[in-house]
Structure formats: C-alpha cells, structure tokens
Amino acid sequence: MSALLIATNRYFDNHFERPGVKLLPNEFYTTAEDMVLMTVLGSCVAACLHDPYAGIGGMNHFMLPDDGADPGAAASESMRYGAYAMEVLINELIKAGGRRERFEAKVFGGAAVLAGMTTINIGDRNADFVRRYLALERIRITAEDLQGVHPRKVAFMPHSGRAMVKKLRLQVPGVTEREAALAREADRLRAARTRAQVELFAAKRPAAPQPARPRIELFGGRGTAPGAGSPSAGSPYAANLSRKQEA
C-alpha cells in the first residue's frame, strides 16, 4: 500500500492569524495544534472530526461514496472514496489518542454544482453516505451544511472543534472543471459496474439439462435397503445371470 495522502500545503492564514493547511481532494490531516484546516468543496464532502476531551481533530476531503472502491487499489486512489477516507480519519485520530465514543462530527459539501446534473447527483450521494456512515459508527453530527447548489469554503480548527463555512459563487475557477471530471469518472464507474453485473449474470447461467442416465434398480431381500445386497435366488435377474455363467 502506498503512503496515505496527508495534506502538505502549509501556509499562514492572515484572516485567522494562525498556521494553516490547505486540503486538496483525496487528502486528510489530523493534529492537536491550534491551527486552521481549509478546503474548497463542490460535490465533494469534508468530514471534520473532533475529540473535545483530547483536544485533537482532523478533516478529510473525499470525492465519491463507497461504491466503486477497489479493495486492491493503492491508498492514494482509495482516499477518493468516502468509506476509506472516513476509516483513515477515524483510525488516525485514535492513534493520536482520541476515543471513538467522544468524537463529534461536522460535515460540509455535497452540492450540485454542475447545471443539469440529474441522472447522477454525486453531491446527494456523498451527503447521504456521510450521514449514514457516521450513524453506523455512532458518531454524533453536531453541525452540517450539505447539498444545495453553491460551492463552499470550509475552515476547521481541530484543537477547538470550531468550524466556519462560506458559500461561494457558482463558477469558481478550478471547481467547475473538477466537477466535470468527477462526473465523467462517476459515469465510467457506473458503466464498469454494469458490465460486471452482465458478465456475472452470463457466468451464472444454468447449464443445459443433461439426459438422465439409465438406471437398473436392484431389489434385495426383506429388510435390505433398495440398491443394496445381491439379487435373491430365483429372481429373473439371478436366473439370467446363472445362464450367462453356464454359457
């Protein structure tokens, strides 16, 4: 497995007057430092987890929900999918001293940024996924800003758990292009799953019925199960067998 995609784009945030890290799609970051984690979201979702007792937190940024993930894929590819991105974030916080039962979540994103996206609304799927995942993990969502049509800029302070969101104009340089590429990728994955289902159906077709093999049933004496023992003396089968032996 390749190295996990930990965000490395560090900077100093003049607005919040503290060090910051900018997260790109597929990345995550965990820390106990008093800093700000920043990301821009379209249909993608960012989950921000915080342990108020330990004073640690983290953020991820995933592009698609759990379907389509290849268990054999490298970590850099799997981080695109919500199931893997959430698992990594939770595990890394636990390694740093957090406790799952204390985690609180704030979730953002899942917008329908591309006009006319009706057949595949990636944002809705991502939003539904993160809610279901956290419910199954019994992690409480304390704040959310999901779905809608506007991209978002999210700032999260992992030490305090404070989060802020800013709605952006519809056409943000880089976001629209990324969303179009993501829609094409979702189409490709859906087509691949359809092909796999067709191949699986073809492979499982029942074989053509074979003609029944002729059977000779042997009747034994009283108390003997059908098919067991030798033919009884005096039976037609025994008489025929005796004549063949004499010949």
Swiss-Prot record:
Region feature Disordered, mapped onto this chain: 204-247
Skewed-composition ranges (Low complexity): 227-239
EC identifiers of the protein: 3.5.1.44
Keywords: Chemotaxis, Hydrolase
Broad enzyme group: hydrolase
One of the record's GO molecular function terms: protein-glutamine glutaminase activity
GO BP annotation list: chemotaxis
Hydrolase in keyword set: yes
Function text: Probably deamidates glutamine residues to glutamate on methyl-accepting chemotaxis receptors (MCPs), playing an important role in chemotaxis.
UniProt cross-references to HAMAP family, sorted A to Z: CheD
Name the record gives this protein: Probable chemoreceptor glutamine deamidase CheD
Organism for this UniProt entry: Burkholderia orbicola (strain AU 1054)
Lineage, broadest ranks: Bacteria, Pseudomonadati, Pseudomonadota, Betaproteobacteria, Burkholderiales
Gene of this entry: cheD
